A protein has these predicted regions:
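Small/polar-rich, solvent-exposed N-terminal microdomains that initiate assembly or binding
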Residues: 1-62
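Short, charged interaction patches at domain edges and termini
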Residues: 1-19, 59-68, 104-140
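Short, conserved turn/kink motifs that form compact alpha/beta structural patches or helix kinks used as
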Residues: 53-55, 59-84
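"Short basic amphipathic alpha-helical interaction patches in structured regions
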Residues: 71, 88-92
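Short, conserved charged micro-motifs
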Residues: 83-88, 137
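A common structural junction motif
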Residues: 93-102
Length: 140
């Protein structure tokens, strides 16, 4: 059996989402921080001034007998208001739904839902399953 190397799904998501949002005309798509962890809110790692943040988490997933795998991701979205958070989360889910690349072959996002927590910052959450394509690991 050939060893298969799969891409870093979080890095792929961050690159895709950040560039896709830059191309969008909606005001709530402007100045969105996209990363794989929540800021610590220290001087060196502040919450974004725009209050717009998208955080992705790779939740793993099974591989197949060929070069494919299923990557499950969780996506959290924050913005200044409940309405803006909802709009940004719906846009992010749509951008995931349309995402195709040499690595990502198919996506199935869920609909976002509100998950505002103790911080009182408006937040939403959705998940997606991605069919990703790996490549044969070169021999050493």
């Amino acid at each position: 059996m050939v060893a298969i190397l799969h891409a870093d799904v979080e890095a792929e998501f961050i690159g895709h989402m950040a560039s896709a949002l830059l191309a969008r005309p909606e005001a709530y798509a402007d100045s969105v921080m996209v990363r794989n962890r929540v800021p610590t809110e220290t001087t060196s790692d502040p919450w974004p001034a725009s209050k717009r943040l998208i955080v992705v988490r790779d939740d793993g997933g099974p591989t197949t007998q060929d070069v494919r795998a299923t990557a499950r991701i969780g996506v959290r979205v924050w913005a200044a208001t409940e309405a803006e958070t909802s709009d940004l989360a719906l846009l992010a889910a749509a951008l995931v739904r349309g995402w195709r690349s040499p690595v990502v072959r198919r996506t199935e996002p869920t609909r976002p839902y509100s998950v505002t927590e103790e911080s009182r910052r408006p937040a939403a959450y959705f998940t997606a399953e991605l069919t990703i394509r790996g490549r044969a690991l070169p021999t050493a």
